[in-house]
């Protein structure tokens, strides 16, 4: 069965490598696109740096206690 999964990709300073982990799963792609839309609206209100690459990819740039945190959220089709 086909479904869609939202993955979060970031650089882990603890593991010293790029980590790609499943973040959310849905059967319908439109539900995940809506989730990214809602996230984009929230980031805009909170004045967080972000870039919506396309309807399936959102990039977020944040700084926390002097540490730069970059997250990329991507929707991918998976078989379950």
Predicted regions, residues:
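Short, mixed-charge low-complexity intrinsically disordered segments
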Residues: 38-80
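Short, intrinsically disordered low-complexity segments
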Residues: 1-7, 28, 41-44, 51
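Enrichment for repetitive, rod-forming helical segments
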Residues: 9, 15, 36, 49-51
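Helix-centric, low-specificity signal for extended rod-like, repetitive segments
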Residues: 1, 22, 35-37, 45
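Generic "edge-of-domain/loop-turn" microfeature
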Residues: 11-15, 32, 80
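A short, exposed loop/beta-hairpin motif centered on an aromatic-Gly-Thr core
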Residues: 17-33
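Extended low-polarity, hydrophobic cluster-rich segments
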Residues: 4, 25-26, 69-71
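Short aromatic-glycine-(Arg/Gly/Cys) micro-motifs in beta-strand/loop hairpins
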Residues: 1-21
